[in-house]
UniProtKB/Swiss-Prot annotation:
<dbReference type="InterPro" id="IPR047575">
    <property type="entry name" value="Sm"/>
</dbReference>
<keyword id="KW-0694">RNA-binding</keyword>
<dbReference type="Pfam" id="PF17209">
    <property type="entry name" value="Hfq"/>
</dbReference>
<dbReference type="GO" id="GO:0003723">
    <property type="term" value="F:RNA binding"/>
</dbReference>
<dbReference type="GO" id="GO:0006355">
    <property type="term" value="P:regulation of DNA-templated transcription"/>
</dbReference>
<dbReference type="GO" id="GO:0005829">
    <property type="term" value="C:cytosol"/>
</dbReference>
<dbReference type="InterPro" id="IPR010920">
    <property type="entry name" value="LSM_dom_sf"/>
</dbReference>
<feature type="domain" description="Sm">
    <location>
        <begin position="9"/>
        <end position="68"/>
    </location>
</feature>
<dbReference type="InterPro" id="IPR005001">
    <property type="entry name" value="Hfq"/>
</dbReference>
<comment type="subunit">
    <text>Homohexamer.</text>
</comment>
<keyword id="KW-0346">Stress response</keyword>
<dbReference type="GO" id="GO:0045974">
    <property type="term" value="P:regulation of translation, ncRNA-mediated"/>
</dbReference>
<protein>
    <recommendedName>
        <fullName>RNA-binding protein Hfq</fullName>
    </recommendedName>
</protein>
<comment type="function">
    <text>RNA chaperone that binds small regulatory RNA (sRNAs) and mRNAs to facilitate mRNA translational regulation in response to envelope stress, environmental stress and changes in metabolite concentrations. Also binds with high specificity to tRNAs.</text>
</comment>
<comment type="similarity">
    <text>Belongs to the Hfq family.</text>
</comment>
<dbReference type="GO" id="GO:0043487">
    <property type="term" value="P:regulation of RNA stability"/>
</dbReference>
Amino acid sequence: MAKGQSLQDPFLNALRRERVPVSIYLVNGIKLQGQVESFDQFVILLKNTVSQMVYKHAISTVVPARPFNVAGHQNAQGGYGAQDDMPSGE
């Protein structure tokens, strides 16, 4: 299962570390906006005026509001949060 998340985890971690605003579209068409606060294998914690736990199986699309750098934000952990910052190697 780790191979399936080899793109997903660095993408979400870069969004989290750079505090990039995102729009998350759910499979039912609802649009959520905020910043990725943390995530794991099953959920994303999205922060705006409140924090929302969004299950990944309900997500259709994640759209960053601005360009960001995915390179250098990878580590071998299965989830990321504010206290899990790893050296970026940049």
